Amino acid sequence: MNHSRSHALFAQAQTVLPGGVNSPVRAFKSVGGEPFFVARADGSYLFDVDGNRYIDYVGSWGPMIAGHNHPAVREAVERAIRDGLSFGAPCAAEVTMAETITGLVPSCEMVRMVNSGTEATLSAVRLARGATGRNRIIKFEGCYHGHGDSFLVKAGSGMLTLGVPTSPGVPAGLSELTATLSFNDFEGATALFDEIGPEVAAVIIEPVVGNANCIPPQAGYLQHLRTLCTRHGALLIFDEVMTGFRVALGGAQAHYGVTPDLSTFGKIIGGGMPVGAYGGRRDLMEQIAPAGPIYQAGTLSGNPVAMAAGLAMLELVQEPGFHMRLSEATSALCEGLKDAARTAGIAVTTNQVGGMFGLFFTDDIVESYAQATACDITSFNRFFHAMLQRGVYLAPSAYEAGFMSSAHDATVIEATLAAARDAFADVAR
């Protein structure tokens, strides 16, 4: 493939954008090489500035569940922009969006719109601290909740040690308020609550880890956290920015049958536009200003164009059988990838929940961040580039989930698997 225009653009971008990008993973640092620059997208495909076409399994990191540039979403945006781009005042679409979310996610009795997933998680944690009068939070290895200071923390040597910052600029005093656990560790969660339970405002978790590739919860794990939070008076926050409306119509909480106190959303509810939301029990949400004393605001929150796009997308995912078909297509892809790897003599396993999937270069079932980081990253990187050269775009990191859309039909999946058979053969050489 020719990437001359992308190469020139990346060189130009590095003179005016830190690292040449506006989000680190886009720079291909994890896999090596240089990123391609996208000119347009349609259905299951991306087209770069050099005219190359790629089958896309990133889907803008999750929101494009019905495929890129879906006519219903595009037309909703076109209608909305005729009336204006931003009002800074209430509009009918934000009420409809809130009613839609509360109708689909029973744990959310009220919703507040924001502008990003990061903003949603930051706001939910502030609400949890304000509502409980406590300051500490618990998060999990491999779970990403945006770039807020409280979330850029990893565990020290042992589960009960204080958190230490993973980014310069995060005050140590703030990071000490975040404790980190291993995902799917039942005993560790119990022990940590026994140690610091009265200080914990909230547990925040990706119910399916999507930022350490794709790691589902073990049976009963989310319910175990629900029980611990209830017992110790802490709130349970599900970060459903990735999983919301993707793994099931009601999100991971519906899929696993566990009810959080607060939930955060993004991606799909904007149909590709910048958006976020958090919601939960009425008694909690009514503590947010102006109804209550816990402050949170945003100039562009409830933006009418983003609301129009999101409402159109949510109509699409409510079509009968949508999630069943999406899950079946994702399963077909995963089984085909494993078969192709097996034929090439390469150890590969997959995880899948609904329209999310993960590809791991290992024989082991991956159920933790430690297992994910122990996989053969070098082979993944070689496979990534071999697929890219064959016109298939996977997430440019071994630690990111893949995303299926309803536009990935049987023909697209077979083309992907044909490329994978050749790519695995390259890796095996």
Swiss-Prot record:
Reactions catalysed according to its record: (S)-4-amino-5-oxopentanoate = 5-aminolevulinate
Pfam families to which the protein is assigned, alphabetical: Aminotran_3 (PF00202)
GO molecular function: glutamate-1-semialdehyde 2,1-aminomutase activity; pyridoxal phosphate binding; transaminase activity
UniProt entry tagged with the keyword Hydrolase: no
One GO process term, biological-process aspect: protoporphyrinogen IX biosynthetic process
InterPro entries for this protein: 4pyrrol_synth_GluAld_NH2Trfase, Aminotrans_3, Aminotrans_3_PPA_site, PyrdxlP-dep_Trfase, PyrdxlP-dep_Trfase_major, PyrdxlP-dep_Trfase_small
Coiled coil: none
E.C. number: 5.4.3.8
Similarity-based family: Belongs to the class-III pyridoxal-phosphate-dependent aminotransferase family. HemL subfamily.
Quaternary structure annotation from Swiss-Prot or TrEMBL: Homodimer.
Organism domain of life: Bacteria
Enzyme category, top tier: isomerase
Any one of the GO CC terms: cytoplasm
UniProt KW keywords: Cytoplasm, Isomerase, Porphyrin biosynthesis, Pyridoxal phosphate
UniProt-recorded name of the protein: Glutamate-1-semialdehyde 2,1-aminomutase
Keyword Isomerase annotated: yes
Post-translational modification N6-(pyridoxal phosphate)lysine, affected residues: K267
Cofactor(s) of this protein: pyridoxal 5'-phosphate
NCBIfam families assigned: hemL, PRK00062.1
Compartments where found: Cytoplasm
